[in-house]
């Protein structure tokens, strides 16, 4: 590898680079069009118009029936919390939550807290490929279910869940259905108006938008109790002065994603496959997750009997950014809860490394990464074999 080349970023499921055109769209709203959208003067009117346009753009990406079904938030975590807590507060006579064992910590940490308060949570298992036990999900729904919350796509393996089918069964049971679509947004077509999904969470920074802003899709007619109280912003559904630059950035990011989604999905999928094939040629490694139904940008590769942390560290020193899983659990010494739920053996689980691409990833970067991984893994295995020989001689 050339010592002068630019760093290679393959951790796009953690966050993405804000698109330069998104930044340019945001800039005037810091210093020129800086009004409060609730103010009754020209500055406020400019801000209000910008928010309406962003709402329209995001509604278009989601395929929602009405622009006002979009509620802007500080991000996916807030949206997840708002959806689940609202369902428990508004679904009279229903006090149970159904979710899965592989959800993001923004959902699982909340359900653990709710369980400590006496709220019954039914956790549905997945199989060795990370696919949901569909029959167990259907059986878990009942007259006391307030909400079922299932992610659209897993952030660690990319496995896609059949959320539209799950939403239909949930509605038949009289409960609300929520999906955490933070990883899916901008990568798959959602078309919410053709579904029975009641609520959906998303975050701007996963689709080349700014950090600190997201949204909750709230289907028209769905009862909702705000998580944050105060002013009447967002039709009384989320109090607080709107983050106008962030909302504008999210709107622009949504426009770009809608324009490029299908061609980029195909291109990125081909690059992901090339990356996988190049790495798998080294042997003693395997792709984790559902390889037939996953996000085009994501691959989680386990290097048998090696430490993924050591591989990621060496790649970082070589200027290549990857991760072991969710950045939100970075620093934790516990193995991935997703891989544990999939019952991946310890000798394989500890060698897992996630590679996640974006529309900015190039063919040259993928080939460079394959060479770097191959070199690092070859050296680590040679060192391991030498150590074994020394110990047995």
Swiss-Prot record:
Binding site for [2Fe-2S] cluster: 328
Keyword Isomerase recorded: no
Methyltransferase as UniProt keyword: no
Subunit structure, as described in the record: Homodimer.
Reactions it catalyzes: (sulfur carrier)-H + L-cysteine = (sulfur carrier)-SH + L-alanine
Organism: Bradyrhizobium diazoefficiens (strain JCM 10833 / BCRC 13528 / IAM 13628 / NBRC 14792 / USDA 110)
Enzyme class, broadest EC rank: transferase
UniProt modified residues of type N6-(pyridoxal phosphate)lysine: 206
Name the record gives this protein: Cysteine desulfurase
